[in-house]
Regions:
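Hydrophobic alpha-helical transmembrane segments
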Residues: 1-72
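Hydrophobic cores of alpha-helical transmembrane segments in multi-pass inner/ER membrane proteins
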Residues: 58-64, 140-144, 193-201
Length: 201
């Protein structure tokens, strides 16, 4: 697993993929942080991380990062080399997953410095801020896992990216969809059934 992890991390930083992901996400989060926390003197960084611009960029970057992790290897048939190597399927998956989380962790560590920067200008809710950052990391970990799973069941990178984007978009929309779900059991069951039928189609 360690060999796969090192290989994947190296591939992200010997190409532009890792650098573009880190730079683009850091740029957007940094801009929103400046506008909300610095310019508007808002102490809690969680407001920055839940902002729509950050969410939209995240929805785009995650599919781009995960679309070729397994799909490209299935398409080029190089996945057979992995499966014949002296490692288990679980070790392959974990190696690739931890590698992509390592790239994301660079952004999280950058964000961790923002509350410290704000501390020079007033009282900062550090516990709430770092809890929000931890939640942001866990959210990213879930979405990357979803992206890797979808990449593993298709050979087409575009399909992998589109489906991953759709799943993440749907998860973001869930909080707005709760208002249209009826409170009574039977109508709720009907709405839920229709929802899953649409997903199946």
């Amino acid at each position: 697993m360690l060999a796969i992890y090192k290989k994947e991390v190296k591939s992200y930083f010997t190409t532009m993929t890792g650098y573009v992901f880190i730079a683009f996400l850091a740029l957007v989060v940094g801009y929103v942080f400046y506008m909300i926390n610095v310019k508007s003197s808002y102490a809690w960084i969680g407001k920055t991380l839940e902002y729509s611009y950050v969410s939209i960029v995240f929805m785009i970057l995650v599919p781009v990062m995960t679309m070729k992790v397994f799909a490209d290897e299935r398409h080029t048939k190089t996945d057979q080399m992995l499966f014949t190597a002296p490692v288990t399927v679980g070790q392959i998956v974990w190696g690739k997953y931890l590698a992509i989380l390592t790239v994301f962790l660079v952004n999280v560590l950058i964000i961790c410095m923002y509350p410290l920067f704000m501390a020079d200008y007033g009282e900062i809710p550090f516990l709430a801020s770092y809890s929000a950052i931890g939640g942001f990391f866990l959210m990213g970990a879930v979405y990357f896992a979803v992206g890797l799973f979808i990449s593993s069941i298709t050979e087409n990178q575009i399909i992998s990216a589109v489906v991953t984007f759709a799943v993440i978009l749907l998860s973001f929309m869930m909080q707005y969809m709760t208002g249209i779900v009826p409170s009574k059991p039977m109508p709720t069951a009907v709405v839920t059934a229709v929802f899953f039928v649409i997903l199946a189609v």
